[in-house]
Amino acid sequence: MERINTRKALVGSVVSSVNDKTIIVAVDIYKKHPIYSKRFKKTKRFAAHDEQNKAKIGDIVKIIETRPISKTKKFRLDKIIELAKEGN
């Protein structure tokens, strides 16, 4: 029987990189209200493992689900999609 890769992949921006090998990524999730059908934005913050400390604040990154690394870290950095603009 073939095993299917069902890991979640999320794209968001880095809002904190203070801790060693850890980044906090804010992911915007758009939902639709079940009764009123209005779309609204919900922002969730995920702690992700960054082994080489590459990501900086403002970068757009892709994180993927992995085994639990600590109490709050269940994602790891997959790749940096876009670097933060300098001077802002």
From Swiss-Prot:
PROSITE patterns tied to this protein: RIBOSOMAL_S17 (PS00056)
Keywords attached to this entry: Ribonucleoprotein, Ribosomal protein, RNA-binding, rRNA-binding
InterPro entries (alphabetical): NA-bd_OB-fold, Ribosomal_uS17, Ribosomal_uS17_bact/chlr, Ribosomal_uS17_CS
CDD domains, per the entry: Ribosomal_uS17
GO biological process: translation
GO cellular component, one term: cytosolic small ribosomal subunit
UniProt GO MF annotations: rRNA binding; structural constituent of ribosome
Pfam family, one: Ribosomal_S17
Family: Belongs to the universal ribosomal protein uS17 family.
PANTHER family linked: 40S RIBOSOMAL PROTEIN S11 FAMILY MEMBER (PTHR10744), SMALL RIBOSOMAL SUBUNIT PROTEIN US17M (PTHR10744:SF1)
Database matches in NCBIfam families: PRK05610.1, uS17_bact
Subunit annotation: Part of the 30S ribosomal subunit.
Purpose: One of the primary rRNA binding proteins, it binds specifically to the 5'-end of 16S ribosomal RNA.
Stated name of the protein: Small ribosomal subunit protein uS17
Gene name linked to the record: rpsQ
